[in-house]
Amino acid sequence: MKVKEVMSAELRGVRTDTSLKDTAEHMRLLDIGSLPVVSPENNRVVGMITDRDIVVRSVARGADVSTQNVGDVMSSPLVCCHEDDEVEEASTAMKAKRVRRVLVLNDKNQPVGLVSLGDLAQGPIDQAELTSVVRNVSTPAPAEAP
């Protein structure tokens, strides 16, 4: 099965210069946990911001989320796959890079969607492989320096 058959095609983004407070509010209103991050200079996707990025890299460190910007805490570089890739390729990328979401690109390398662990669970992926991916991305990474 192809990634385009299981991905979420409605793609919203946020700019690197958007405050974390505004970003968190946007995520809350959309009931989502991540957004692609776009550079205001060239309108290209340069990273991903997740609810976890906001909590771990900002709130837990005592930063002011009303003045700190997305570009300061986003995850980068991006983990991507193509819409015509097999679902197993997306799961392999998630497992290797320890991420829960992968940006989906078309044949012109333009963003067209996101594929998440939840999307994979809805597809025909082997349950043992899905379990392996979930375990790997859920294993704590080495702690970041303060």
Which residues does each PLM region occupy?
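The conserved cystathionine-beta-synthase
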Residues: 13-31, 38, 81-98, 104-106, ...
